[in-house]
Amino acid sequence: MAKKWLNKVKWDDNGLVPVIVQEVGSNDVLMFAFMNRDALQRTVELGEAVFWSRSRKRLWHKGEESGHVQKVHEIRLDCDEDVVLLKVTQIDNIACHTGRHSCFFQKFEGDVEVGDWQTVEPVLKDPAQIYTKP
């Protein structure tokens, strides 16, 4: 049976929708990812973020390897119905695979001629300690 709420989302030609993940409380933007219908449905069912991994071509339950799960408080759809916003609690304060709080840790500084990207967030945990495979 088709779920009306899933049909309201404007999925792209690949059946995906962009997702912005924002931390409840701080309002920090933690990451950007994609979901397909199954990922969005699983997110609602679990109360935890589940995305579509374009590189692995499979569902990706955020934190499945690292333990850095995202507990979902709200799911919003933008005015054009083609972008999803998740408001989450980030477990262990690490959202990025680099071991940082946010994937947006590089800030542009300077001007058009001599500007450059500066790292403005510290590594909270070495990724080698996060992603250990037996």
Curated annotation (Swiss-Prot):
InterPro entries according to UniProt: PRA-CH (IPR026660), PRib_AMP_CycHydrolase_dom (IPR002496), PRib_AMP_CycHydrolase_sf (IPR038019)
A GO CC term attached to the entry: cytoplasm
Keywords, comma-separated and alphabetical: Amino-acid biosynthesis, Cytoplasm, Histidine biosynthesis, Hydrolase, Magnesium, Metal-binding, Zinc
Gene: hisI
Cofactor note: Binds 1 Mg(2+) ion per subunit.
Complex formation: Homodimer.
Binding site residues for Mg(2+): 78, 80, 82
One Pfam family linked to the record: PRA-CH
The organism's place on the tree of life at top rank: Bacteria
NCBIfam families recorded: PRK00051.1
Pathway assignment: Amino-acid biosynthesis; L-histidine biosynthesis; L-histidine from 5-phospho-alpha-D-ribose 1-diphosphate: step 3/9
Example GO molecular function: magnesium ion binding
Keyword field contains Hydrolase: yes
Functional summary from the UniProt entry: Catalyzes the hydrolysis of the adenine ring of phosphoribosyl-AMP.
Family, similarity comment: Belongs to the PRA-CH family.
Main location: cytoplasm
Catalytic activity: 1-(5-phospho-beta-D-ribosyl)-5'-AMP + H2O = 1-(5-phospho-beta-D-ribosyl)-5-[(5-phospho-beta-D-ribosylamino)methylideneamino]imidazole-4-carboxamide
Cited SUPFAM superfamilies: HisI-like (SSF141734)
GO biological process, alphabetically ordered: L-histidine biosynthetic process
Descriptive protein name: Phosphoribosyl-AMP cyclohydrolase
Location within or outside the cell: Cytoplasm
Binding positions for Zn(2+) per the UniProt entry: 79, 96, 103
Enzyme Commission designation: 3.5.4.19
